[in-house]
Amino acid sequence: MTIIFLICLDASTQSTTNNSINNNNNNNNNNNNNNNNNNNNNNNNNNNNNNNNNNNNNNSKVFDFNIF
Protein backbone atom coordinates (compact mmCIF):
# COMPACT_ATOMS: atom_id res chain seq x y z
CA MET A 1 0.00 0.00 0.00
CA THR A 2 2.85 2.36 0.82
CA ILE A 3 4.49 1.77 -2.55
CA ILE A 4 1.27 2.59 -4.43
CA PHE A 5 0.89 5.77 -2.38
CA LEU A 6 4.45 6.87 -3.13
CA ILE A 7 4.00 6.18 -6.84
CA CYS A 8 0.81 8.27 -6.88
CA LEU A 9 2.53 11.02 -4.91
CA ASP A 10 5.45 11.04 -7.33
CA ALA A 11 3.09 11.21 -10.32
CA SER A 12 1.17 14.07 -8.71
CA THR A 13 4.39 15.95 -7.98
CA GLN A 14 5.59 15.44 -11.54
CA SER A 15 2.28 16.70 -12.89
CA THR A 16 2.47 19.79 -10.70
CA THR A 17 6.04 20.41 -11.83
CA ASN A 18 5.07 20.04 -15.48
CA ASN A 19 2.17 22.45 -15.03
CA SER A 20 4.48 24.96 -13.40
CA ILE A 21 7.00 24.65 -16.24
CA ASN A 22 4.24 25.04 -18.82
CA ASN A 23 2.91 28.12 -17.06
CA ASN A 24 6.36 29.65 -16.95
CA ASN A 25 6.88 28.92 -20.63
CA ASN A 26 3.52 30.46 -21.47
CA ASN A 27 4.33 33.54 -19.43
CA ASN A 28 7.70 33.87 -21.13
CA ASN A 29 6.09 33.52 -24.55
CA ASN A 30 3.50 36.13 -23.67
CA ASN A 31 6.17 38.49 -22.43
CA ASN A 32 8.21 37.97 -25.58
CA ASN A 33 5.16 38.62 -27.73
CA ASN A 34 4.37 41.77 -25.79
CA ASN A 35 7.93 42.97 -26.12
CA ASN A 36 7.90 42.28 -29.85
CA ASN A 37 4.62 44.14 -30.22
CA ASN A 38 5.96 47.08 -28.26
CA ASN A 39 9.10 47.15 -30.36
CA ASN A 40 7.06 47.04 -33.55
CA ASN A 41 4.85 49.85 -32.31
CA ASN A 42 7.86 51.93 -31.37
CA ASN A 43 9.43 51.32 -34.76
CA ASN A 44 6.21 52.30 -36.50
CA ASN A 45 5.95 55.45 -34.42
CA ASN A 46 9.54 56.35 -35.18
CA ASN A 47 8.99 55.78 -38.88
CA ASN A 48 5.86 57.92 -38.80
CA ASN A 49 7.70 60.67 -36.97
CA ASN A 50 10.54 60.54 -39.46
CA ASN A 51 8.11 60.71 -42.35
CA ASN A 52 6.33 63.65 -40.78
CA ASN A 53 9.61 65.44 -40.21
CA ASN A 54 10.65 64.83 -43.79
CA ASN A 55 7.33 66.13 -45.05
CA ASN A 56 7.60 69.21 -42.87
CA ASN A 57 11.11 69.86 -44.10
CA ASN A 58 10.05 69.52 -47.70
CA ASN A 59 7.07 71.81 -47.20
CA SER A 60 9.11 74.49 -45.47
CA LYS A 61 11.77 74.89 -48.15
CA VAL A 62 12.03 78.42 -49.44
CA PHE A 63 13.08 79.04 -53.01
CA ASP A 64 14.58 82.40 -53.89
CA PHE A 65 14.28 83.35 -57.53
CA ASN A 66 16.21 86.36 -58.69
CA ILE A 67 14.49 88.03 -61.59
CA PHE A 68 16.71 90.15 -63.82
Swiss-Prot record:
| Compositional bias annotation for Low complexity | 22-59
Q: So which residues have sugars stuck on them?
A: N18, N58
The residues that cross the membrane are none
Keyword list (alphabetical) reads: Glycoprotein, Secreted, Signal
Gene Ontology cellular-component annotations: extracellular region
For the region Disordered, give the residue spans.
Answer: 14-68
Residues in the signal sequence: 1-15
Q: What protein name does the entry list?
A: Putative uncharacterized protein DDB_G0277445
Which organism is this protein's natural source? Dictyostelium discoideum (Social amoeba)
Compartment(s): Secreted
